[in-house]
Amino acid sequence: MAGERAQNLQDTFLNHVRKNKIPLTIFLVNGVKLQGVVTWFDNFCVLLRRDGHSQLVYKHAISTIMPGHPVQLFEPDETAPEKA
């Protein structure tokens, strides 16, 4: 597989925003908007913290996750051709 990454993209993304305490907006499939910082996650849920309170959010209920600022997970591939 390409590079045999130890983690999948989802885990890499969640771990990055957790370690860097990046504020997120999470939209659920029912349209509810949640905001906070990821403090923990596993295969099934995400623990979101805001204003001293934690919310356990099941991943199957999540539609979209938007970080508060741009996130770069991987180094740019220098061998890839540049897009014009």
Curated annotation (Swiss-Prot):
Domain of life: Bacteria
InterPro entries, alphabetized: Hfq, LSM_dom_sf, Sm
Keywords: RNA-binding, Stress response
Signal peptide limits: none
Domain Sm as annotated: residue spans: 11-71
Gene3D superfamilies: 2.30.30.100
Keyword RNA-binding on entry: yes
CC per GO annotation: cytosol
A matching Pfam family: Hfq
GO annotation (BP), single: regulation of DNA-templated transcription
GO molecular function (one): RNA binding
SUPFAM superfamilies: Sm-like ribonucleoproteins (SSF50182)
Function (record text): RNA chaperone that binds small regulatory RNA (sRNAs) and mRNAs to facilitate mRNA translational regulation in response to envelope stress, environmental stress and changes in metabolite concentrations. Also binds with high specificity to tRNAs.
Family according to the record: Belongs to the Hfq family.
Quaternary structure annotation from Swiss-Prot or TrEMBL: Homohexamer.
Designated name of the protein: RNA-binding protein Hfq
